[in-house]
């Protein structure tokens, strides 16, 4: 994933003749944003191991609600009372799915919720960095940081890919 994003960043910077695409006005924020991308992907994919696909996606779909809440808190954007009510209803829906008072509640069900929160924060920071950095700069940092982290993880957890899996990859696109 991150290798192809890096290719896209390099292609786009060449197309725009942006030779200094790797220069950021806030490199720490770009690196933090990139780490959030890796954390979000990891939490969400890991949630599939422990939850049904439907439950993981239901909980993960809270990300847009989190973005609205964070935009009010971090970006100081105005959010109407109706929107806050919708946010509250969204949280109630997730609580119904999670059933935190149930004796069968599993803390692993928090993985897609963490992923949703991290994705929301990632999107807020993306808006912040877009005020001073080009899109290809953000793509570059996301891809480099992600590629480094995932390469390190792959060296520890890699399992050989069989022919069936290759066929599935080709079928998915």
Where are these regions (language model features)?
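Loop-to-transmembrane-helix transition segments
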Residues: 18-43, 107-115, 160-173
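C-terminal transmembrane-helix exit sites in multi-pass transporters
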Residues: 46, 64-85, 157
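Transmembrane alpha-helical segments that form core, pore/gating elements
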Residues: 9, 103-158, 169-171
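Hydrophobic core positions of alpha-helical segments in small-molecule transporters
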Residues: 32, 59-62, 82-85, 141-142
């Amino acid at each position: 994933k991150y290798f192809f994003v890096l290719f896209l960043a390099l292609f786009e910077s060449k197309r725009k003749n942006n030779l200094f695409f790797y220069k950021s006005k806030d490199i720490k924020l770009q690196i933090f944003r990139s780490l959030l991308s890796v954390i979000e992907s990891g939490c969400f994919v890991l949630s599939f191991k422990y939850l049904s696909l439907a439950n993981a996606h239901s909980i993960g779909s809270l990300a847009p609600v989190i973005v609205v809440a964070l935009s009010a808190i971090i970006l100081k954007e105005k959010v109407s009372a109706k929107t806050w009510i919708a946010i509250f209803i969204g949280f109630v829906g997730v609580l119904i799915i999670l059933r935190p008072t149930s004796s069968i509640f599993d803390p692993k069900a928090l993985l897609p919720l963490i992923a949703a929160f991290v994705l929301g924060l990632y999107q807020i920071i993306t808006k912040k960095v877009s005020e001073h950095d080009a899109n290809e700069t953000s793509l570059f940092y996301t891809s480099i940081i992600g590629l480094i982290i995932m390469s390190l993880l792959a060296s520890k957890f890699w399992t050989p890919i069989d022919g069936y899996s290759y066929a599935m990859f080709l079928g998915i696109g």
